[in-house]
Amino acid sequence: MLKTTRDLKLATAITGSYPRPLWFDASLSGRSFKAAMGESMFREQYTDAVAAVINAQEAAGLDIVTDGDSRFDLAVGGKSWFFYPLERLGGITGHRDTSRGWMSRHGLRPGKILWEVQEAYQPGVVKKKLSRGPLEYTELWKVAQRLTDRPLKFGAICAPALASMLWNEFYDDDKTMILDLCDIMNAEFRELADAGCPLIQVEEPPHHSRALLEGSTDADLEFQTEAFNRQLAGVSAEIWVHTCWGNPNQQRVHWNVPSYERGLPHLLRLNCDVLTIECASSEGRDLPLFKHVKTDKKIAIGVVNHCNTVVEPAEHVAALIRKALEYIPKEQLVISTDCGFGREGLSRRIAFYKCVALVEGTNIVRRELGLPEARVRVADPKLWFAGP
């Protein structure tokens, strides 16, 4: 149910992850978050890092903030997006050197960066029935939300995406394994929503990527919809669903950005309030797909590129928003990033100014539409050495 963004036009938020401060050099390494917070050094580093990430988003003028996915370890290529939950689930023992089909599907081989990234991932092996472990999403959200008065969006990988980083040696088929994962994640998301988290983002349903595969059928995609919606049953927060075309080590998985065309009708059947799409990387090529779409969902478009270290000019961001408004009403448009910033590839400064560009570009369009603008604290000339 739309709550936080219900009455907001052109609300702004990043996807989730953000580069760590260099001094935050601790990792959970599979430990319980609550147990780690009993260590004075970890508690101080973690809390200060989350505060720094939130402060940067507030200084940039974002309406909604995140904790930067600061629970994730110092790991290769954003590995913890998968492995923060996998390291804490019961039923997984050991690992293998490759993920199922991923390397061959994308033509990876030694000498390519994503080959090394995937080698570092070490997918787990399911030996017993999967069971819930100490994911502690509620505790993570509470620590972050008490550092800000702005609504804090908490994001986590979806169950079907988790399954892609597992070798199944227990279940009769992968579908049964996926449904068990969905039930585990549903319990976690319900607890998080019941604690008061206003926005829960469930990340990377496989529909748009699977739709590209040779032999992929509508029945396959319909099962993914059933599974994805199963993990959202009874979750009372505003639900965002994030989609993109990949972000391992801040790299493109597809050199030529694919289209959402086949996957979009299936994505629109997900039980969410806000659907995000990668848009900056393709210069909004898929926006005309929304011309004839009738939906109550809000659509969040990425207006800055996570795979590019060049900060987009505000006018460039504004132009993409104007293009989106040709197909999506302003009441249903949300402004975001293509994907997260915290996958080894971007510095904090670059990530910060991409946030600033996002908000300043949105402010240009807000002025044109007569909407209230957000204050971008860092853009106030009075606060700089050479200011007036």
PLM features: residue spans?
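Domain-level signal for soluble alpha/beta catalytic cores
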Residues: 1-388
